[in-house]
Amino acid sequence: MNKNLPEDPQLREMVKAALAHQVTRRAVLGGAVATSAAALLAACAPADKPSLTPATDVSDSDPTLIWSNWTGYMDLPNNPTTLDTFKSETGISVTYREDFNDNDEYFGKVKDQLALGKDIGADITCPTSWMAARWINAGYVQTFDDANIPNKKNLQPAYLGEAYDPNRKMSLPYQGILAGFAYDKKAYKDATGKEAPAVLEDLWNPALKGRIGVLSEMRDTVGIVLMDQGVSIGDANSLTEDAFMSAIEVIGQKVTEGQIARIKGNSYTQDLANGDTIVAIAWSGDIMVLNSEAGYDRFGFVLPESGGTISADCFVIPMGATHKKNAEKLMNFYYEPYNAAVLAAYVNYITPVVGAKEEAIKLDPALADNQLIFPTEEFLKLTQGFRALDAKEEQAFAKAFQKIKLGA
């Protein structure tokens, strides 16, 4: 297999979907911010553990919903927002919280409640697919009632067939994510004389010492370093423990030298905005938000020549959620092509909803050429999905990455 193409069959299908001018979905979130090895092992809980009982659903008598999500992942500046439209159409009020900064960090906050089937303070949330798989395998999430999600039929077929949830009974893709290089255009050119970073080595320029940030999401940051070293991160024969530790050594060295100043979750955007960071390993959609807040095209985003990472964040309903039907209605709303298009046009992530591209073009014809929402085959050839890890690998890899984060 061409190592530049995603190994995961879901992501390979995204390429075909792009060729057919269909819409694909987001990705990447990979994982870290300080959680203990014990927490990581708990995330890989055995499938034969005692089953949990879903909480009583009070949706019919209480038209409310709490949604925990990532920062910059909603069209909040729009008037009305899609959340406003959802309320007007359904009567359901959504308390929307941007408190999902990092997969492992969030898991660390809610793992005890999850394990007991208790309320985690959210009726619906959006972990990255690898974390969603852990929750599903551990029995932490509820099974959907598809009768409440008729628009599920609009899911891109590429997202069916996942081993952890083949028929999408417990998870639905929210957005697809790309990770690559975000950079302050003027500051980067002033410091280096170049227009934009192209390869990882560009981040190690002495002129950028102390002005580099990387994501605390292990699969993105380490994945990009691995790809720079010629490793196919979707292939178990290529992404070995030795290869991973070699990439960790590079990152650790740059942290020790002071080249990398920060390892952060979604809060990395603050460092770019205030000028502390000039270049960061970052998520594509965040750059649209940063530029919107800046009021001009201050930041750029590029995939490294060796490639960027791709993955997806997924809707899940925790076992302790008490507004399951309301959460299902929310998913159904965002799987309506027009609503998906409005959201994608703002957040600039890949949408998993069939028909959203056509609706987006009606909103703004220029969106048809936006590679961050509707990537072409050539663009997707520069992306790879991080392969699934077994429990032993997860523990070893996370422990090594955690050690580096503590030193940053």
Regions found by a protein language model. Name each.
Residues 1-23, 34-39:
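N-terminal secretory signal peptides
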Residues 21-27, 38-59:
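N-terminal twin-arginine translocation
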Residues 52, 58-133:
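Early extracytoplasmic/lumenal segment of secretory-pathway proteins
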Residues 132, 211-217, 221, 225-229, ...:
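Ligand-binding pocket segment of bilobal, Venus flytrap-like solute-binding proteins
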Residues 282, 286, 292-346, 406-408:
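Extracytoplasmic/periplasmic substrate-recognition and gating elements
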Residues 317-382:
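Mature extracytoplasmic/periplasmic domains
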